[in-house]
Swiss-Prot record:
Keyword Ion transport found: no
Identification of the protein by name: Deoxyribose-phosphate aldolase
Active site annotation, chain numbering: 94, 158, 187
Keyword terms: Cytoplasm, Lyase, Schiff base
Amino acid sequence: MKYTIDDFARLIDHTNLHADASNEDMKKLCDEAKKYHFKMVAINQVQSKFCSEQLKNTDIDTGAAIAFPLGQQTIESKVFDTEDAIKNGANEIDYVINITELKNKNYAYIKEEMKQMVNICHKYHVPCKVIFENCYLTKEEIKKLAEIAKEIKPDFIKTSTGFGPSGAKVEDVKLMKSIVGDNVKVKAAGGIRNSDDFLAMVRAGADRIGCSAGVKIIEALKQRMQDDNVTTIEINR
């Protein structure tokens, strides 16, 4: 598949999830998203209203992070926070699974949590992304989660929050994609800071990239295409 600069930009969830982010920081994030035509801004739930107002009358989404970054909230709390975020303007949701219950092998809990989160998102026609936080998981746990997702069908499964000890890995993206196939998309996030890493994740099967380095990445890709005198880059997946 051949990608233009805009195609690449539309893969990016432009991210600022820092605890000390100000309204000025959020405005900058949204302004950059508009300038580069990113797909979404990824922000903490409490900033849903502010960012959705900044992005009004654009095709750029406001993505609220739920139970971020630990996932240690009840299902009821996650569902409440999701609906609250949506009512305040969020039109994409990324939530962190309850890793404790996964470690307990309480797969019924994980399945019920995912089902309720997907249902509340889809009630409002909002995409739901499930954050695995792979740095804490074994390969078998990643596989099991992906199998549950294949059954429940969230819109995306996601590698990481970016706040754990490590972020996205190419082998994890490949593993996740190999299980869900075309039923669910994969989002790579965490530690993707340059154009080589970005392209590697797309080649591995990621359909969305969460990163705070989106401007730097797009500018590097523009320069690469200019140097090669091309308007597209072909990616074989």
